[in-house]
Design a protein with these regions (language model features):
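A positional/architectural concept
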Residues: 45-51
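Short alpha-helical segments and helix-capping/turn motifs at coil-helix boundaries
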Residues: 51-54, 77
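Exposed, interaction-prone extracellular/peripheral surfaces
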Residues: 1-38, 44, 57-62, 71, ...
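N-terminal low-complexity, intrinsically disordered segments
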Residues: 65-75
């Protein structure tokens, strides 16, 4: 199979609509990650992946004995060699499979984009030597795969992400609470959902994770038509989660709809920021490499404070600089 049609003309980013037509979910994830890594060598982010893998930026309070002067000479930035307990991360991906994720106006539903994003993050982290797990939810928890780094883990994870989004309404509380109960070691929790759920209960569940020392990243996946409400003709609109239909003239409600959606998005983002969680709104038309880049930049900013929950610090990975 020749994946070149997924390359945007004149650029190196993958068009999501073309990407979703590529083979399996596992193939799509691998293609995004490998394309991303290759693109780093021809972009302003050249060398970024190496720094992310083996180093972290110096922050006040760090021991200057561990500064790597060779990296400073190449980049003119201060970096420290990562310790062993900083490089081994445990990540759990929480992916929304409720019926609202089945909506899509650009040839692929939100569910396919969300699954590809989750599989991409899993493929990237596994390549770093990190343990990755998965929890899918719709109303309640559907599937749970504990974080592991071993042969076959990525295959099991991507198989659980295949299939349609056909569960009941979005409820963010059960998956967040289950992760808080069963994941004892501090790690990374990534929530991938359209976040079309009440915000009031979200704060309590997220605070359980951040208070326990977990790093939390939230990706709100929305279709461009949901954001802009770009429909033109009056018609019957169906609520995918409740099944209710209502006759709507888009021209009449467009502005109020946009205002309410924006207010909801601000509430979700403010809740995340208040709790120290990273928040990203990702339209399904956005190239997945950019979402991956944002994820890596989050890890660069917060990696200095995230530590696995075990006593002591190891020797620097690869020896003292």
């Amino acid at each position: 199979m020749n994946p070149s049609p997924a390359i945007r003309p004149g650029g190196r980013l993958l068009d999501p609509a073309a990407l979703m037509r590529l083979g399996t979910l596992e193939l799509r994830a691998r293609w995004v990650v490998e394309g991303f890594r290759h693109g780093l060598h021809r972009s302003p982010y050249h060398g970024f992946s190496v720094e992310f893998t083996e180093y972290r930026q110096y922050t006040p309070g760090d021991d200057p004995r561990f500064l790597d002067w060779r990296v400073f000479g190449r980049s003119d930035r201060y970096y420290l060699k990562k310790f062993e307990d900083e490089t081994n991360l445990r990540c759990h991906l929480l992916v929304d499979r409720s019926r609202s994720m089945a909506f899509g106006s650009a040839g692929h539903p939100k569910a396919a984009y969300a699954a590809t994003l989750a599989a991409t993050l899993a493929h990237f982290l596994d390549g770093q030597g990190d343990a990755v797990g998965l929890l899918t939810f719709a109303g309640g928890v559907r599937d749970f795969l504990p974080a592991r780094h071993r042969p076959g883990q990525l295959r099991r994870l991507t198989l659980l992400l295949e299939g349609d989004a056909d569960g009941p309404d979005t409820d963010l509380v059960p998956p967040l609470e289950q992760v808080g109960q069963v994941v004892r070691k501090r790690g990374l929790v990534v929530l991938v959902s359209d976040m079309l759920a009440p915000v009031d209960r979200l704060e309590r569940s997220l605070s359980m994770l951040t208070a326990a020392g977990h790093e939390v990243v939230v990706f709100q996946v929305l279709d461009p038509a949901e954001i802009d409400f770009s429909f033109t003709d009056a018609a019957l609109f169906e609520d995918l989660e409740s099944g209710r239909t209502v006759y709507i003239d888009p021209a009449v409600i467009r502005e109020s709809y946009r205002e309410r959606l924006a207010a909801h998005g601000r509430a979700v983002q403010e809740t995340c920021e208040r709790l120290g969680a990273a928040f990203h709104r990702v339209p399904t038309s956005r190239p997945l490499e950019l979402a991956l880049l944002e994820f890596i930049q989050d890890r660069e900013r917060t990696g200095a404070r995230l530590r696995p929950g075990r006593a002591g610090r190891g020797s620097p990975a690869g020896g003292r600089p």
